[in-house]
Structure formats: structure tokens, C-alpha cells
Amino acid sequence: MLRKLKVLLFIPLLFVATACCDRGAEMAKYTIHFDLRKAVKMNLPEFVDSIFVIPLATNDSSLIKNVVGLSFVDSIFYINDNQTNILSFDSKGNFLCSTGKLRGSGPNEYFACIAFNILENGNCEIFDGLKHRLWEYDSNLNYVSSSELPEDVLPASNFLRVSKDICIIEDVNSLKFYSSKEGRVLKMISLPQKKGLPSITRNSGLKKLNDEIYYSLRTPERILFKVDIEKMSLQPYYAFDFGQHNLNLRELPNELPLSFYQNYVMANDGVAFVADKLVSSTMQMLSLIHISEPT
């Protein structure tokens, strides 16, 4: 019979510290153990109170081509559409405004929105990788300020402001700690990616919760890291242990054809591939892909 593909969502409630099979997992503060043989089906009402759909207003100004980023701040949804403009909607889906009219080649106009932040004062900060600038606009889309970015901040796929001075800039191979005051990268951390292995999730690996910053690799790494802003370092925080189903990226061979890495997830029975990791103040959620043995 055909193999059965399982996409599982877990809400772990118990954390037990123990040793695991790779260095990152051994250093993690918490280890969460899963026995995939005992996986049980859960009904959605068991862990959520309600689910509802918010239809977004549709007009010529609010059409969305491709959602590449989403933030929900002070009851307003902000959507990064195809890295070109930011659209905002209220909690009922009513269209508020778009930064599209600010996009261009003029002196106070941005050209590309790789990522954005909504600042504490409600202003929008746009990371423009093509013009090499950080732009700030107020809630009425008026130009506030801009600053030039040095060449070494690129390439970049996302950025997150963690203080008035420090931004974390993410790309495929590194995290860069950038000082707005000094206008330079203070430190760069190389990420333990396996070259060629495809990203399972498109979501940004940077998550901010209660002034803490977490980072998750986009490839199927089973470690969730915590970012130490003062030391500008990554610390293994949660390790997810699937026993015999563990995947250790560091054990994969190097310099094989790209097709090997692209097909690795679907070609390996019995291995649990972590797809995404989320942390909140009340729960920790993990989604994974596991291909069961043939039956």
C-alpha cells in the first residue's frame, strides 16, 4: 500500500530535561519528548475556543497578490503584499490604507519592502533592500525619516527591531545584529543550515513574545533557539526529541546533487521533520511531517 503522509500538530504541556543526540539538543534548556506511536487524534475544540474568518474588503486599492508578511498590532492587520506595499485592515476586515502611493524612485519613497515593523508609536518602518535604506512613515503615511544601510546587511529576507537601536536582520545563512545609531553590523552569527536542504516553512524564523526573541531555522531543525540580545547570540531553548525518528541535519552528507536534498523529506520513511515552531505565553505548539512505514 502507499505510504501515508501525516501532518501532526502537538501542544506539549510537560517538559523534561534530558540528553539528546546532537550538541544543540544537549545544550537546550528544555527537552520535549514525543512518542509518535502514541499519537492520538484531537478535536479542534479541545484546544481552541473559537475560529472565525475575517473577509477582507476588496477594491482596487486593497487587492493582494502574495502575502509574504503579516502583523496584528493594536487590532489592525498589516500585510506585506509581494514585498511591494503594506496594506492595513481593521479587526473587521475593513480596508484602511496602503503604502503603495509611497513606492517609487523619489527622495522620500521606498522601492521594495523586504520586511516591515510597526513601531511602538504606531509608525511603519520599512526595510528597503534595493535602495539600501530604512524608511519610517507615520500612521497617516507621511514621511518621517530614513537612514542608509551598509552593503553588508544584504542579503536579507527579514528583519526585526528589538530595541530603539538594535535590529536583527535574517538571511538564509546568518543573523546580523545591526545598530541604527552606529549604522553598522555589530555582529553576524552563522546559522547551522544544511546547504541545499529546502525550507519547509516560509514563515520568518524570528518571533517576538513578551520582549523575548525566539528563532527557528526554516529547514527542519528540531531546536528552537532563544536570542540573547545583550550577548548577541543564539541559545538552544527547546529541543524536540522523537527518539528513533530524530533527524540530525549535521549528519547529512555534504555536496550531493540538489535533487537529493529537495527530495529528502519525502524519500525517508520514519523520520520526523519539524515544519514550524511557535511559542506563546500559554502554550508551545509544534507542527511536523512524519511519513509512516508502509502498511
Model-identified regions with their sequence ranges:
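C-terminal motif of bacterial Sec signal peptides marking the signal peptidase cleavage site
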Residues: 18-19
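A short helix->beta-strand "capping" segment at the edge of beta-propeller domains
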Residues: 38-63
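Blade-loop segments of beta-propeller domains
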Residues: 58-61, 95-120
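Short coil/turn segments at the loop-to-beta-strand junctions that recur within blades
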Residues: 60, 100-107, 149-156, 191-196, ...
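Repeated scaffold domains used in trafficking and secretory/extracellular systems
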Residues: 66-69, 110-115, 153-161, 198-205
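Residue-level detector of Asp-centered blade-edge/turn motifs that repeat once per structural unit
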Residues: 72-74, 118-121, 161-164, 209-210
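Asp-box/WD-like beta-propeller blade repeats and closely related beta-sheet repeat scaffolds
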Residues: 129-171, 189-195
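Residue-level detector of conserved catalytic or cofactor/ligand-binding positions
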Residues: 286-295
